[in-house]
Amino acid sequence: MTSNRAFQILLGIYISIFFLYLFGPLIIMSVTAFNSAEFPSITPWECFSFRWFNEGKIAYDGQRLAGLAADRDLHVGFITSLFIALGVVTLSVPIGMSAAIVLTQVHSKLRTLFYSMSIMPVLFPGVVIGISTVVLWDRIATLGGEGIISELGRNGIFLTILGQTCFISTYCFLIFVARLQRFDTTQEEAALDLGASQTQVFVKILIPYLMPAIGSSAVIAFLASFENYNTTVFSIL
């Protein structure tokens, strides 16, 4: 066995262990949900059942909790989280793409400063971002008086979308930067020399090239928003 072959085998084993460690708890919890046993566990396995999705478990105070299918609060929370995630994707992807494109156009001396400012939101704790968003928009709503500004400034879903977008757009920015680093700028120059406008170059050359990054950043933004807690718990009023 060659050293290269041995390295590939060891790498495969390492990756398998890594993903097993990462997704193992999720797999165990998913399997446990279909065990009809009173105590949530894989062993002893009584029988495959949808019991806990329908009737739920008994709480410590003796009351029976609603099952997954009947838990209205869970349904409302899921729909709200989905709506917020879609809103964050709608804002974060264009913001990240625009910032990455600007980064490639600014002067080299300003590029480091612009890059540092663009990634700065991820350095702040989510708690700080959530509280800051609420405080800022509360002041704006107070100064705006009655009207749409006042309503938006006290709308939890709106504030949560803005708060999450502050740092999730940075993730999108980094994805677009990585993609643009491999972009051949001579394609734009050739198109401009042939009479294409800046809009045509952007739509027909740059956007198709960035489509993989757009898809990746949209997925990352959706997942980051859907599982976020620190920012959401302080901004969702």
Give the positions of each predicted feature.
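Transmembrane alpha-helices
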Residues: 13-14, 19-26, 166, 172-179, ...
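Individual transmembrane alpha-helix segments
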Residues: 65-91
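Short membrane-interfacial helix/loop motifs at transmembrane-helix boundaries
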Residues: 24-72, 233-237
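Membrane-interfacial helix termini and adjacent extracytoplasmic/periplasmic loops
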Residues: 40-47, 110-111, 127-166, 199, ...
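Hydrophobic positions within alpha-helical transmembrane segments of bacterial inner-membrane proteins
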Residues: 26, 85-97, 101, 127, ...
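N-terminal signal-anchor/first transmembrane alpha helix
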Residues: 1-32, 114
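Transmembrane-helix boundary motif in ABC transporter permease subunits
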Residues: 1-6, 83-118, 131-138, 185-187, ...
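Short hydrophobic faces within alpha-helices
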Residues: 78, 103, 120, 178, ...
